[in-house]
Amino acid sequence: MAKILVLYYSMYGHIETLAEAVAEGARRVSGVEVTLKRVPETIPAEAFAKAGGKQDQKAPVASPQELADYDGIIFGTPTRFGNMAGQMRTFLDQTGGLWASGALYGKVGSVFSSTGTGGGQEHTITSTWTTLAHHGFIIVPIGYATPELFDVSHVRGGTPYGATTIAGGDGSRQPSQEELTIARYQGEHVAKITAKLKS
């Protein structure tokens, strides 16, 4: 059975919501076991609460070493100036031992993201791919295989690189049904490829 990890960081809940949709999509594929986890918070609890961070996230916290236990990993991170959030960066910076042993080589990897106003969403995904490439991941984008990506009639996230959501400058916009559909597609697509490679 192929094992998929959906690993995310979410401060305000937008990425958490996308992560749940990604995991839901991956679970549609038979012969796949899906786990949803998050990376540790690095902001002190008091500052996190003061900033309005979402404190009731149910997903357990992952450790870097356990990444080796999965056949495919789908990473979710908000955009911070066109790059992954510092919490995800800190987590991945602890995978040097896995890199040295080649423990992640040949695993399937994919990325989804969120932004406040849309700026940097694609670059966040592709810049995260750099870390995955150093580990030897087989990187899987979603392409334009889902019709929602062609809808330009209103504001929405979603790219051929991976699912995204646009939260708005104040974070009040929640992921739309279209964005969640794209996220589910990404999970299902990555799970299918992982299962094929595992068989």
Curated annotation (Swiss-Prot):
Which molecular-function annotation in GO is an example for this chain? NADP binding
Superkingdom per UniProt? Bacteria
* Entry EC number(s): 1.6.5.2
**Its family?**
Belongs to the WrbA family.
Q: Which residues bind NAD(+)?
A: 12
Disulfide connectivity for this sequence is none
Record-given protein name: NAD(P)H dehydrogenase (quinone)
Q: Which organism is it from?
A: Serratia proteamaculans (strain 568)
